[in-house]
Regions:
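Short alpha-helical donor nucleotide-sugar binding micro-motif in glycosyltransferases
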Residues: 153, 258-259, 266-271
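Nucleotide-activated donor-binding/catalytic signature segment of Leloir-type glycosyltransferases, i.e.
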Residues: 243-259
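Conserved acidic donor-binding segment of nucleotide-sugar-dependent glycosyltransferases
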Residues: 311-312, 316-323, 332-337
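Membrane-proximal helix-turn-helix segments that form the acceptor-binding/catalytic region
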Residues: 75-79, 131-159
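Aromatic "clamp/platform" in nucleotide-sugar-dependent glycosyltransferases that forms part
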Residues: 279
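Carbohydrate-associated surface elements
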Residues: 165, 186
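Conserved donor-binding/catalytic core segment of Leloir-type glycosyltransferases
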Residues: 7-9, 196-214, 220-227, 231
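Short hydrophobic beta-strand element within catalytic cores of glycosyltransferases
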Residues: 296-299
């Protein structure tokens, strides 16, 4: 079947923040420059709405609808908006699965993480990290959710994962290996480029949703101890707790909140170090952006950041065998400026090679349209 368009399905979309929102927006905009039809089906806190921007048709379905109405409306919208189009599901997995069973249309999935674990963390049900959570005995409601999520992956033609860590989790959920494709998240190297000019007046920057597993409390404490200023970009349920912590320990922290994508390169250009302290990460867009802009980066081993950072070559991975913490990694970077300068250059090269949007988006498009 020759398909002349693409329909991207995502649970979140800008101005909401987060990796899936960023992907849905950049990928659909990119696809609209190649294909005659590009559309997005997503959710919103407001009323149902329909708009067109950058040549992309965007249908937003209200989260205020009751669950049955929302699922049916979503399934019908995905089906209706994907005539002659491939369907790429990056969120709303259960809605897409329902559409498949009711209306018989095939789709490709791109998963950002384990949505069952994320919901359990956000609701306070668990404090476990993503790996330990896999073997835990879940309450009935979550068992049902896990079964439904797995069914949505089994029903897909292909399952795209952005990191080796996530690939191993998906295999453990019982998805056939030959159905899984590893394609890293990627960024536009035109938008995020190295700018050596300008004053570096931000010591440490981090860009993420403010949720517990991002480990921002440790970053605040480390910056407080080392007397470094910290800029936190992003918003989320942990904001108040983090603001209180910063006050309590006298840290110099600037909470910027959610900002427009095109303001990020300027912030990166002013920053010395980027820290990503999450216990789970697929391929973090912010980490890729920072490295493309020549900001020395620190992240965690045993996460998708292992696919991005070559430890002690083009960055530092914490919580690994050599025992780096956020604080000791920052201290090491401050005291080894030659290493940092060399690492920044190598990081930019590696980003161009492995995380190039043009190359990776083409692969995703080919899989979705085949």
């Amino acid at each position: 079947v020759l398909r002349s368009g693409i329909c991207v399905v995502s649970g979140i979309y800008p101005p909401e923040s987060g990796g899936p929102a960023k992907f849905a927006s950049t990928f659909s905009k990119w696809a609209s420059s190649i294909l005659p039809n590009a559309s997005v089906v997503t959710l919103t806190d407001g009323a149902d709405s329909f708009l067109e921007e950058n040549g992309v048709r965007i249908r937003k379905i209200s989260r205020q609808r009751n669950l049955i109405s929302r699922y049916l409306r979503s399934a019908i919208s995905i089906f209706g908006d994907s005539k002659n189009s491939g369907i790429l599901v990056n969120g709303m997995f259960l809605e897409a699965c329902l559409m498949h069973f009711l209306l018989g249309k095939k789709y490709v999935v791109k998963i950002p993480g384990d949505i069952v674990w994320e919901r359990a963390r956000n609701s306070g049900l668990t404090k476990l990290n993503i790996d330990d959570f896999q073997n835990t005995n879940l309450p009935f409601k979550y068992k049902l959710f896990r079964a439904a999520f797995t069914l949505s992956l089994r029903s897909a033609k292909k399952v795209i994962v952005p990191s080796s860590h996530l690939k191993n989790l998906v295999i453990a959920w019982g998805i056939q290996r030959e159905k899984i494709e590893l394609i890293y998240n990627s960024i536009s190297l035109d938008n995020f480029s190295y700018n050596p000019k300008g004053e570096k007046n931000i010591d440490v920057i981090t860009v993420s949703r403010l949720v517990t597993w991002k480990g921002l409390d440790e970053v605040i404490l480390a910056c407080s101890t080392l007397d470094l200023n910290l800029t936190i970009v992003g918003d989320g349920p942990e904001r108040l707790n983090l603001e209180n912590l910063a006050l309590k320990c006298g840290a110099n922290v600037n909470f910027v909140g959610d900002i427009a994508q095109d303001l990020l390169p300027n912030l990166y250009a002013r920053s010395k170090y980027f820290v990503l302290n999450s216990t789970f990460e697929a391929t973090s867009y912010a980490l890729l952006e920072a490295r493309a802009c020549g900001v020395f980066s620190i992240a965690n081993s045993k996460t998708g950041s292992e696919d991005v950072i070559h430890h002690r070559v083009d960055g530092i991975l914490c919580k690994g065998d050599d025992g780096f913490t956020v604080e000791s990694a920052l201290k090491y970077a401050i005291n080894n400026q030659n290493f940092v300068d060399d690492a920044k250059f190598k990081a930019r090269e590696r980003t161009e090679e492995l995380f190039n949007m043009e190359i990776n988006f083409k692969r995703i498009l080919e899989l979705t349209l085949s």
